Amino acid sequence: MKDILLETGGPKPSSEEWLKKAKQSDDSNKIGMYLVHNGVVRSTSKSSVYEGNPAKEVCGMLFTADKDKAEDAIKNTLLLDGVYYVRVWMADGKLAPGDDIMQVLIGADIRSHCVDALTSLVGKLKNNCVEEKEIK
């Protein structure tokens, strides 16, 4: 099994540095595409974005991550066809609009595997591994 590359808290790491390290990984010769997701806190509430409900503007967020669940999600992503590299950083604590919530890097053999893996992992992290409480 590949190393589980998960970090939480502290400042968001450089995606450029992550890419440099990914390109030096043991399986880098099998990787044809890297994708990075950088989620940030927005000032619009989830209910106004997803449901169209008028809502008070968000002035912050309390964000916590369950590392064990996140590690399981990463392990499962590494089992997907063509996925050879996964790295995740998630914030911790009180965040303001514009602050980074998470960064995810996926390395896979072809575009469709990379896009599918990124979409799947970010969905699992957001829906199953973190708690986001909007501050209004």
Segments (PLM) and residue ranges:
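N-terminal, polar/charged subdomain of small-to-medium soluble alpha/beta proteins
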Residues: 1-100, 107-136
